[in-house]
A protein has these predicted regions:
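Residues in the helix-turn-helix
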Residues: 34
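HTH-adjacent hinge/linker in prokaryotic transcriptional regulators
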Residues: 2-9, 13-22, 26-29, 39-56
Length: 56
């Protein structure tokens, strides 16, 4: 879980933003609910900013 969350942060930092559909392509084995929980956690810890349809 922590590895996946760090990968999400790295993707956002590299590209400046990422859409939810792009996250699904990077993590096809992970459910939508889990990815949304990851985004919520990363936003709450101020590692990313959640936006409609993804993160930046």
């Amino acid at each position: 879980m922590e590895n996946r969350r760090q990968q999400i942060v790295d993707l956002v930092n590299r590209d400046g933003k990422i859409s939810f559909s792009e996250l699904k392509q990077f993590f096809p084995e992970v459910s939508d609910v889990t990815l949304r929980k990851d985004l919520k956690y990363l936003d709450s810890t101020m590692q990313i900013v959640r936006v409609h349809g993804g993160a930046k």
